[in-house]
Swiss-Prot record:
Keywords from the named record: Membrane, Metal-binding, Transmembrane, Transmembrane helix, Zinc, Zinc-finger
Gene: Rnf223
PROSITE patterns per UniProt: ZF_RING_1 (PS00518), ZF_RING_2 (PS50089)
Chain coiled-coil ranges: none
Protein name: RING finger protein 223
Location relative to the cell: Membrane
CDD domains per record: RING-HC_RNF183-like
SUPFAM superfamilies: RING/U-box (SSF57850)
Gene3D superfamilies found in the cross-reference section: Zinc/RING finger domain, C3HC4 (zinc finger) (3.30.40.10)
Topology in the lipid bilayer: Single-pass membrane protein
UniProt keyword Metal-binding present: yes
Native organism taxonomy: Eukaryota, Metazoa, Chordata, Craniata, Vertebrata
Cystine residue pairs: none
Membrane spanning stretches: 230-250
Molecular function as annotated in GO: zinc ion binding
Organism: Mus musculus (Mouse)
């Protein structure tokens, strides 16, 4: 029956293949023709029970890969700054466009400009974080860079009106305009974009009582410091002469360390007795 339905193919299979392999090959060949949407395909089965051919259809144009796919890449939102990942607004996060058409928020570009050394003309050149192409910053600072109107138009309606922002030293300052006529002025808002940290508050130093005014003698004593040293050295030399050198010169002259010679005690007693007798004789006369 199969031979009558497709005689040419079955006769070729009977000639080229053994008898016990003919039926599985025919079954595989018929499965290829019955698949929907495949058209006529040439099937080459390699096993007895060949798998059923599958014909995946083409992907729809513009179809993005599923987020759960391992190879899928998460695309950043166009309304976020690529540096700080903060949403754009109309104050410090205003979308500013560089000369290379890359867009970043105002605060990040102001920090980049503050970190760059000053050029010859006194203006900084900010390199793009993506392509490294330099962009000259105007004299007024980063707030004077061109605003991306294309991204600004995609913001909500209340953020499409750009607020006036200016640079004072290392601070971005803004004075938000009142949204309604009856709203009061909210004052100034600022953010520091400099590299230096704010100074820590120091504790107050206790005030000490002034020292009493020294007298004239103390002032003279402090003024003639060199003369004090000369006097001290002179006194030390005199003491050295009296204590050491005087006994030495006495020993060299007299041969004895005692420079003062004391009289004998007997001679002194006889002298006293003679004097007493002389006074007694004079009294009797």
């Amino acid at each position: 029956m199969v031979h009558k339905k497709r005689g040419g193919v079955t006769s070729w299979l009977f000639r080229k293949s053994p008898v016990h392999n003919v039926l599985p090959l025919l079954h595989s060949w018929e499965s290829c023709h019955q698949a929907t949407g495949c058209g006529v395909q040439l099937c080459h089965p390699t096993a007895r029970t060949a798998p059923q051919p599958q014909c995946p259809g083409p992907l729809a144009q513009g179809a993005a890969p599923s987020p759960s796919t391992p190879g899928s890449v998460k695309v950043a939102s166009p309304l976020e700054c690529s540096i700080c990942f903060s949403g754009y607004d109309n104050i410090f996060k205003t979308p500013k466009e560089l000369s290379c058409s890359h867009v970043f928020c105002l605060e990040c570009l102001a920090r980049l400009a503050a970190a760059q050394p000053a050029g010859r003309s006194g203006r900084e050149a900010v390199p793009c974080p993506f392509c490294r192409q330099p962009t000259t910053v105007p004299v007024a600072g980063a707030p004077a860079l061109r605003t991306s109107r294309q991204l600004q138009a995609k913001l909500p309606a209340h953020l499409q009106r750009e607020e006036p922002v200016w640079l004072e030293g290392t601070k971005l300052c803004c004075r938000p305009l009142p949204t309604t006529s009856g709203q009061e002025d909210g004052g100034f808002v600022s953010v520091d974009v400099g590299l230096s940290k704010p100074a820590e508050p120091t504790l107050p130093v206790p005030v000490q009582d002034p020292a009493p005014n020294p007298g004239w003698l103390a002032r003279c004593w402090a003024r003639f410091r060199d003369w004090r040293r000369v006097a001290l050295v002179s006194v030390l030399l005199l003491v050295l002469f009296c204590v050491i050198l005087w006994p030495v010169q006495c020993a060299l002259k007299t041969g004895n360390l005692r420079c003062i010679n004391r009289p004998p005690a007997a001679t002194a007693t006889a002298t006293v007795t003679t004097d007493a007798l002389s006074f007694g004789v004079l009294a009797n006369n």
